[in-house]
């Protein structure tokens, strides 16, 4: 897939300068975004490749205008909408507007860490 996510060697963006001792998460919301994506993968029925595609398959302006974990949330929204787990209206309202999809089993809290390690 060729897109904004695959910009290795593109001129005009400058070098990638890693932070010394850079943390995995710069703030708590990033940690939560990562956990949400992992926790929803089983009930949503997608894998890491599908999740990555949902993050990366977006218009260049959208992709370049978001931070790393904002892309994770945008990808999660896409996957959840595609599978009927949530509607765009519910995301915009920030609350549930309809009964949940039947037969969707949430991941148990104790299963999240093993899921991350896979």
Segment roles from a protein language model:
Residues 1-118:
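A charge-rich, low-complexity, intrinsically flexible signal that marks solvent-exposed coils, linkers
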